[in-house]
Regions:
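N-terminal Lys/Arg-rich, disordered targeting/topogenic segments
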Residues: 1-10, 284-289
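C-terminal single-pass membrane-anchor helix
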Residues: 247-289
Length: 289
């Protein structure tokens, strides 16, 4: 008679190996999954902003926009630029913080960039707390309500381990579209200039008479941050913009790599559970013998 092949016993070492694999893949997945959760939370913040805006009367919204436009006119020729990422210690006046502050959270609107699939809240100022939460409006520049002779500047971080923010801003090209939503108004901007400058080089952030600009600012090169990447858009009619780049809601998505990691973790977890069950059975059999 042929001898039966002995079944390989599940050892403690096998279980430890599976646990190590499970932990390793979980660590690899954490930044991506955490970023995904933060983006979902950001979408909730944006939705809440829209809900709060709807509660305001037409007269209240018009007054808020009028106050913001009046502020922009007052700021003309009265701007002393410094690097947006050095504004941590700048004292911001209470009047500025009250403008476009729909629900008291400091959120004045949000930006949507279809090309890089981001939708981010815009807050007053560029303190580190603000830049960890979303995009900061560079205090001293025009509030993002559009109009002739305005230039709003919005800043965001790149390369945070748990948030995307402006990480992929270097993928934007001249001709791409981004949208800024404030109250009921959606402003469309088409990118017309991309510059890489030193932190102190802020001339390109100045207002040009008759122009309606919005510039996005982030640090570059990635993880080195010695320079600033400036992506400027010029206002174009909303209807014209949507023909080139539809203004649709952006939903956070997990990357293909993240999905593969999740499936791998599930498979390893199931394998670990099976290994533990077999190990327990083997021990019970040995005790019976």
């Amino acid at each position: 008679m042929k001898s039966k092949k002995k079944k390989k016993k599940v050892t403690i070492k096998d279980i430890i190996r599976l646990i190590v694999l499970l932990v390793a893949f979980s660590v690899l997945l954490y930044p991506t999954f955490s970023s995904y959760l933060n983006e979902k939370n950001g979408s909730k913040v944006v939705s809440y902003y829209d809900e709060e805006s709807v509660k305001l009367s037409k007269a209240e919204k018009e007054q808020m926009l009028e106050d913001a436009r009046a502020y922009n006119k007052e700021m003309l020729g009265n701007i002393d630029f410094i690097d947006p990422f050095s504004q941590e210690d700048v004292e911001i006046d209470a009047r500025y913080e009250s403008l476009l502050n729909v629900d008291g959270s400091g959120m004045m609107g949000y930006i949507r960039i279809p090309k890089i699939n981001v939708e981010l809240p815009i807050y007053h100022g560029t303190s580190e707390a603000v830049l960890q939460a979303g995009v900061g409006h560079f205090w001293g520049t025009s509030l993002p309500v559009g109009g002739e002779s305005t230039h709003t500047v919005l800043t965001g971080h790149r390369g945070l381990p748990t948030k995307t923010l402006f990480t992929n801003m270097d993928k934007l090209e001249v001709g791409d579209i981004f949208y800024i939503k404030v109250l009921d108004e959606t402003l469309a901007y088409q990118i017309d200039q991309i510059l890489t400058v030193l932190p102190q080089e802020t001339d390109s952030l100045s207002i040009e008479p008759g122009k309606d600009y919005a510039t996005l600012v982030t640090c570059t090169p990635f993880a080195i941050n010695t320079h600033r990447l400036l992506v400027r858009g010029e206002r174009i009619p909303y209807e014209e913009a949507t023909k080139q780049e539809p203004d649709t809601n952006i939903k956070p998505e997990l990357s293909f790599t993240a999905k593969v990691l999740i499936v791998t973790i599930i498979v390893i977890f199931i394998g670990l559970m099976i290994a533990i069950i077999y190990s327990i059975r083997d021990r019970k059999r040995r005790k019976v013998r």
